[in-house]
């Protein structure tokens, strides 16, 4: 019964977001400010699914300059958890097929996010070049999921290097963001416990280039894997209380 009520609430939310969200975005199509606005709205839905969401974001996170953000990508719950960590003037980079997702896909495009064709390597590489150009010509930051796909309970997957090529090309630091594991969240469970999203310190890209981009990716992954393990242990203890 709980699952049915939540699905109903989600359906209502999706329709409202699509109708009013698209209408709002059409006033200034593909404006980066929309990503921050709707990230907050989606994050508030975590309460509907019985999650106690805790954001750990530095005080200066909302006034920092440009960065390339990298986050772990677990499952569909990311939409209601890690999306809350999006800061102003940040757009995400997602797969092109997202635009065909009913309701969400059209809103995703209108809010100014970047779509890439991951099935076509040459097009994907070209898009990374476009991301670098966009970073150099604007004050917008980008958010990417370096795993390239949802991990679905398999832990932190190996990282692709696209995000790190973009960071090096634009001469920007990388900021990792980690969300504790949400594989145990169930639609039919009233209390789904704590979920922690934490923003880590920036990683400088100075001294890196195409020849050692893998080293940068590995450094970020090691930090994120350690933080994920730490957060998961903390969540276990919090859920016992």
What are these regions (language model features)?
Residues 125-241:
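Non-catalytic C-terminal accessory region of glycerolipid acyltransferases
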Residues 17, 21-29, 33-35, 48-49, ...:
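Catalytic core of membrane glycerolipid acyltransferases/transacylases, capturing the structured
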Residues 38-45:
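N-terminal nucleotide/polyanion-binding subdomain common to many enzyme families
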Residues 1-26, 59-62, 215-241:
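Membrane-interfacial terminal anchoring regions of lipid-handling membrane enzymes
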Residues 1, 45-48:
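Membrane-targeting alpha-helical segments
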Residues 55, 69, 92, 197-199:
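Generic preference for hydrophobic
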Residues 58-63, 189-191:
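A short beta-turn/loop motif at secondary-structure boundaries
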Residues 28, 53-55, 186:
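Aromatic-capped interface at the extracytoplasmic side
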